[in-house]
Design a protein with these regions (language model features):
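Amphipathic alpha-helical and helix-coil boundary elements used as assembly
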Residues: 1-215
Length: 215
C-alpha cells in the first residue's frame, strides 16, 4: 500500500482543512534520467504546523484507497463466491459509494482465476473492509501494490491510482526502472539506487477470541 507524509508550504495560514481531506493528489519525483515519476494517492490527514508570518507549513498524509477502507467495519457472508469475485464485489462497492471515490481509484486483478474455486461461505466477521481483504489475500498468496494512473492507461481529470492484486510476478510487465543497484553509504551516485536495507518487526495479536453476536 501507500502511506507517505508530505510537508507543504503555503502563503495561507487558514487553509480549510476539511475541504482537503479525500482530495486526490499527485507527487512527482524526478528520476536519475530526468523523467518525472508520479505517485498518486488521497489526502487522508492534514495537520498545520509552524508559521513565520509569511509561510505556513502543513503536513499531509497521503494514502491509497485501501487505507480508506480501514474506517468501515462490517459483518457479512459471501455465498458461492471465489476470492477474485469477492475482491470485485467489495472494490466495486467502494467505487460506487460516491462519484468522488470512483474518480480516485481503479483496480486490476492479475490473478489466475482457475486457482480459486467458489467457496460455500466466506465470512467477514466484524472486521474493517481493509482487514478482511488483507486477511483473505494473504491467506491465498495474493499481494497488492499501487500504481499511478488508470487500469487501462486512459486519461483522467484527477490523479487516479490503481490497486493491483497479483499472485504471480511473471504476470507483471517489466519495470521502467530496470535493475536497481544497491549502494551502501551516502555517496552520490550517477543512478538512483537503494541505500538502506533493514529488518523491521511489529507486535500483532496471536489470537482473537470473540463472543457470539447472537444475543
Amino acid at each position: 500500500g501507500l502511506q507517505a507524509q508530505v510537508i507543504c508550504l503555503s502563503e495561507h495560514p487558514d487553509l480549510p482543512q476539511q475541504d482537503l481531506l479525500g482530495v486526490p493528489v499527485s507527487i512527482q519525483l524526478a528520476t536519475d534520467e530526468g523523467v518525472l515519476y508520479p505517485i498518486n494517492g488521497v489526502i487522508t490527514d492534514i495537520q498545520s504546523g509552524q508559521s513565520d508570518g509569511t509561510l505556513t507549513s502543513y503536513r499531509l498524509t497521503v494514502g491509497d484507497a485501501m487505507s480508506l477502507m480501514r474506517g468501515r467495519r462490517n459483518m457479512r457472508t459471501f455465498v458461492g463466491k471465489s476470492v477474485p469475485e469477492i475482491l470485485e464485489t467489495m472494490l466495486g462497492e467502494w467505487q460506487q459509494r460516491s462519484a468522488a471515490m470512483d474518480r480516485v481509484f481503479d483496480f486490476e486483478l492479475l490473478l489466475d482465476r482457475g486457482r480459486y474455486p467458489k467457496r460455500a461461505q466466506t465470512l467477514q466477521l466484524d472486521e474493517s473492509d481493509y482487514g478482511f481483504l488483507d486477511r483473505m489475500t494473504r491467506h491465498d498468496g495474493i499481494w497488492c501494490f499501487v500504481k499511478a494512473g488508470t487500469r487501462d492507461g486512459s486519461a483522467s481529470n484527477a490523479p487516479v491510482h490503481t490497486l493491483v492484486f497479483c499472485d504471480d510476478p511473471m504476470r507483471l510487465p517489466q519495470s521502467a526502472a530496470g535493475t536497481v543497484p544497491y549502494h551502501y553509504g551516502a555517496a552520490v551516485k550517477e543512478r538512483d539506487s537503494i541505500t538502506r536495507w533493514s529488518e523491521a518487526r511489529s507486535l500483532i495479536p496471536g489470537a482473537i477470541r470473540g463472543t457470539s453476536p447472537d444475543h
